[in-house]
Curated annotation (Swiss-Prot):
GO terms for molecular function: glutaminase activity. It catalyses: L-glutamine + H2O = L-glutamate + NH4(+). It comes from Aeromonas salmonicida (strain A449). This is Glutaminase. The gene is glsA. Belongs to the glutaminase family. Substrate binds at S64, N115, E159, N166, Y190, Y242, V260. Signal peptide: none annotated. Its EC number is 3.5.1.2. Keywords: Hydrolase. Gene3D superfamilies: DD-peptidase/beta-lactamase superfamily.
Length: 306
């Protein structure tokens, strides 16, 4: 089938009956207030064409999707070996906020997309930047072409007030010598990134560089080298959807990154970036209807990286 807004609308209509079968994230009180019936989808091609359906323009909390943006920012500031000396490149097979594996592996997180790994990346940003929160916002505004993007401070505060487990993860890494800055300061920057509000359209545009050999939408110069972009995509394919990455690869067949706000970003290198949003999550913490929508999109377009 040919990519069109009508195709996206038909896919959303097909997955809409799934609404009510998942559960909105409630361990972050501010996220629990998001209406469960929201459903949106946007696709941006490497040529800049945009296709939308449903609530594609409504901003939501990107949560762990921000981990891919933070890693990108770190890769512009550090030699890659400096990053991979402190965080691994392997799937975890454990819950995203697990302490058990971290203890067993002496404070080196499995990958940059679980909480421990993202906290190490945030620690790296804190070391190298005087204003990491502002630099992260500047990056997403530039990549998406939307200067109005902000972090929701109500969500950020809500996460900070319920941050005992993330603090425990950070202090455990500090005990193993894998955390340089004040834990409290890094946590606040980390939660601020998670609390950034973007729409499906914003995200589909922002991540097009991963589908375009490192070159952002409308830019001449690459943000990342093509080789590094390929490596980030490999990590997204193996680690981007918590401990459901294998099932997502099997069903959808695209590199992707999810967040407990209900968003999923996925891409086909050389072609397009897609973002879908539905706040109700499955047991693995990924959008239930969103995953189904991406599976249908891959099927209808006959596209996969495999």
């Amino acid at each position: 089938m040919v990519l069109s807004s009508e195709l996206l609308a038909s896919i959303l209509a097909e997955v809409r009956p799934l609404l009510g079968q998942g559960k909105v994230a409630d361990y972050i009180p501010a996220l629990a207030q998001v209406p469960a019936d929201r459903l949106g989808m946007a696709v941006c091609t490497v040529e800049g064409e945009l296709f939308t359906a449903g609530d594609a323009f409504e901003p939501f909390s990107i949560q762990s999707i921000s981990k891919a943006l933070s890693l990108t920012l770190a890769l512009t500031l550090y030699q890659e070996e400096e990053i991979w000396a402190r965080v691994g490149k392997e799937p975890s097979g454990q819950p995203f906020n697990s302490l058990v594996q971290l203890e067993f592996e002496q404070g080196i997180p499995r990958n940059p997309f679980i909480n421990a790994g993202a906290l190490v990346v945030s620690d790296l940003l804190e070391t190298r930047l005087t204003a990491p929160r502002q630099r992260t916002l500047e990056l997403v505004r530039r990549l998406s072409g939307n200067p109005a993007i902000m972090a929701d401070q109500v969500v950020a505060r809500s996460e900070y007030q319920h941050s005992a487990r993330n603090a425990a993860i950070a202090y455990l890494m500090k005990a193993y010598g894998n955390f340089e800055n004040e834990v409290d300061k890094v946590l606040q920057s980390y939660f601020n990134a998670c609390a950034i509000r973007m729409s499906c359209v914003d995200l589909a545009r922002a991540f097009i560089y991963l589908a375009n050999r490192g070159v952002p939408l409308g830019a001449g110069e690459p943000l990342l080298p093509a080789r590094t972009t390929k490596q980030v995509n490999a990590l997204l394919a193996t680690c981007g959807l918590y401990d459901e990455a294998g099932d997502f690869a099997y069903r959808v067949g695209m590199p992707g990154k999810s967040g407990v706000g209900g968003g999923i970003m996925a891409l086909i290198p050389g072609e397009l970036c897609v973002c879908v949003w539905s706040p109700e999550l499955n047991k693995a913490g990924n959008s239930l209807a969103g995953t189904a929508a991406l599976e249908l999109l891959a099927e209808r377009l006959g596209r996969s990286i495999f």
